[in-house]
Amino acid sequence: MEPIQVHKGKAVVLDRVNIDTDQIIPKQFLKRVERTGFGQYLFYDWRFQADGADNPAFELNQPEANGASILITGHNFGCGSSREHAPWALYDYGFRVIIAPSFADIFYNNCVKNGLLPIRLSPEETELWMERAKESQEEITVDLGEQLIKQNGLETKFEMDSYWKQMLYNGWDEISLTLQYEEAIAKYEHRQSAVNK
C-alpha cells in the first residue's frame, strides 16, 4: 500500500446522506477479485444516464471535480452490505481521503485496509469544509501525522485510532504489518516445535 503522510488534493462535495455500497459500486460490477479497474464503475447509476451518457447533473461529472482526490460527503457513508469493492472503486477512481460526519464501521475498516484515509468530523466541521470546497478549487492539505486538515488559514483537527493511523502512515496492510514481526514469529514457532517434540 502507498503510505499517506501528507496528502494535498482538490476536493469534491457529494452532499448526500446514507450513501450505501450499492450506490458506490453496483452489484453487477463485482465479478472480479482484482483491486483495479473498478473506478470506471464508481457511482455508476448516478454518473451515467440509462443510455450510458454522462449525467450532466451529477457532482463528479462537473468540470471542477476533475482530478479531485478528496471526497467530502454526508452521514453514514458506506452503509449497506459489506463489499470491499467499494473502497477499491473509490481508490481506483483517484480518491485518497474521504471526509464525512460518520461512516459504516465495516466500510471504514475496509477503507483503511485498502489505503483510503476516512476522516470523521462533526457535522458542523463537515459542512464548513463542504462550503470551502464549493467556493474554492484550491488544494486542501491533509496531514495524517498532525491529524490536521488545512487550507488557506482554515485548520481542523481530526481524531484517528493510533493503530489505523500507523497502518496508513506507513503504507502497511495486515500482511506487511505481520511481516514486521517475522523474526519474532519464527522464534516462537521454533520454541513451540521444540516443546511439542
Swiss-Prot record:
<comment type="function">
    <text>Catalyzes the isomerization between 2-isopropylmalate and 3-isopropylmalate, via the formation of 2-isopropylmaleate.</text>
</comment>
<comment type="similarity">
    <text>Belongs to the LeuD family. LeuD type 1 subfamily.</text>
</comment>
<dbReference type="InterPro" id="IPR000573">
    <property type="entry name" value="AconitaseA/IPMdHydase_ssu_swvl"/>
</dbReference>
<dbReference type="GO" id="GO:0009316">
    <property type="term" value="C:3-isopropylmalate dehydratase complex"/>
</dbReference>
<keyword id="KW-0100">Branched-chain amino acid biosynthesis</keyword>
<keyword id="KW-0456">Lyase</keyword>
<comment type="subunit">
    <text>Heterodimer of LeuC and LeuD.</text>
</comment>
<dbReference type="GO" id="GO:0009098">
    <property type="term" value="P:L-leucine biosynthetic process"/>
</dbReference>
<dbReference type="GO" id="GO:0003861">
    <property type="term" value="F:3-isopropylmalate dehydratase activity"/>
</dbReference>
<keyword id="KW-0028">Amino-acid biosynthesis</keyword>
<dbReference type="InterPro" id="IPR050075">
    <property type="entry name" value="LeuD"/>
</dbReference>
<protein>
    <recommendedName>
        <fullName>3-isopropylmalate dehydratase small subunit</fullName>
        <ecNumber>4.2.1.33</ecNumber>
    </recommendedName>
</protein>
<dbReference type="InterPro" id="IPR015928">
    <property type="entry name" value="Aconitase/3IPM_dehydase_swvl"/>
</dbReference>
<dbReference type="Pfam" id="PF00694">
    <property type="entry name" value="Aconitase_C"/>
</dbReference>
<dbReference type="InterPro" id="IPR004431">
    <property type="entry name" value="3-IsopropMal_deHydase_ssu"/>
</dbReference>
<keyword id="KW-0432">Leucine biosynthesis</keyword>
<comment type="pathway">
    <text>Amino-acid biosynthesis; L-leucine biosynthesis; L-leucine from 3-methyl-2-oxobutanoate: step 2/4.</text>
</comment>
<dbReference type="InterPro" id="IPR033940">
    <property type="entry name" value="IPMI_Swivel"/>
</dbReference>
